[in-house]
A protein has these predicted regions:
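Conserved glycine-rich cofactor-binding loop
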Residues: 11, 18-19
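The beta1-alpha1 cofactor-binding region of Rossmann-like NAD(H)/NADP(H)-dependent oxidoreductases
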Residues: 43-44, 64-75, 109
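Substrate-binding pocket helix/loop in short-chain dehydrogenase/reductase
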Residues: 102-104, 108-114
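Active-site helix of classical SDR
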Residues: 127, 164
Length: 277
């Protein structure tokens, strides 16, 4: 059922499409011949993405959506189906925020709620609303959830972010199992560093922001490359997309030697703190 052109010439809905990975998804999907609904909590940012697409003769509309609010996601689905005159063929649950720099017990509970509201409840709401729509359509389609290598990385001082992405990974795996035997393919994207503004726009301490920025500049892939790899993975029915080698190595070690991996992460964090202090 699924060929290499699955992500082409369809109808795509993207959350967090105002910048970064979400904007890259929107532009790439439009280039592949899809009509694209670009949603973001910042509608002006989503419109800027639409303007880029329009400048390349693509078809897209912008709409505001706070993925932490189920009513907003229901409205997004209704708007998309009205514009498409039918169901979408691809849903990308991408909207996300970053929190980091403090240990468990120091992280403000408000930061926990904010992070989980967007990073976890966003994908939950997206899957809850759109999965029945795709099931009823019964046509080849896809759901992409944007997680992170943080979903299995267990890096210290990133607990809220790690937990939100680990849950998104589990959500995606469970959804893929439930949709086995249907024409709906699920892919979870787990990159390490991607060159976006998520670090500077999140709630991260100055020290951690500086470190993450250095790592991103040295090792980060462009969002465009990450998006192309992810869409190709979904084309071919792949569940996991880990664009970078370090993510794939970390994933393998975590699976086969989890306690050794976790101890190693702790040692590396202590050494890193000693070097930078």
């Amino acid at each position: 059922v699924f060929g290499p052109k699955h992500t082409r010439n369809g109808a795509a809905v993207i959350t967090g499409a105002g910048s970064g990975i979400g904007a890259a998804f929107a532009v790439e999907l439009a280039a592949r011949g899809n009509r694209v609904v670009c949603s973001d909590i910042d509608e002006a940012a989503a419109q800027r993405t639409v303007d880029v697409i329009a400048g390349r003769r693509g078809l897209a509309i912008a709409t505001r959506c706070d993925v932490a609010q189920i009513d907003d996601v229901n409205t997004l689905a209704a708007q998309a189906q009205s514009w498409f005159d039918g169901p979408p063929t691809l849903v990308v649950n991408n909207a996300g925020v970053a929190v980091g720099g403090q240990n468990i017990g120091q992280i403000p509970l408000d930061d926990w709620h904010w992070t989980l509201g967007i990073n976890l409840w966003g994908p939950i709401h997206g899957c809850h609303v759109f999965t029945p729509i795709l099931r009823e359509a019964g046509a080849p389609s896809g759901i992409i959830n944007v997680a992170s290598a943080a979903s299995f990385g267990a890096a210290p001082k990133m607990a809220a972010y790690n937990v939100s992405k680990a849950a998104t990974l589990s959500l995606s795996e469970t959804l893929a199992a439930e949709l086995s035997g249907t024409p709906i393919r699920v892919t979870v994207l787990c990159p390490t560093f991607v060159k976006t503004n998520i670090i500077t726009s999140g709630r991260i301490t100055a020290e951690s922001t500086a470190l993450a920025d250095r790592l991103m500049r040295r090792t980060g892939l462009s969002p465009e490359k990450v998006v192309r790899m992810c869409l190709d993975t979904n084309d071919h029915g792949g569940l996991y997309c880990m664009p970078q080698l370090d993510a794939r190595i970390g994933w393998a070690i975590k699976r086969f030697a989890p306690e050794t991996y976790t101890r190693g992460v702790g040692i590396a964090a202590r050494v890193g703190s000693a070097v930078t202090s």
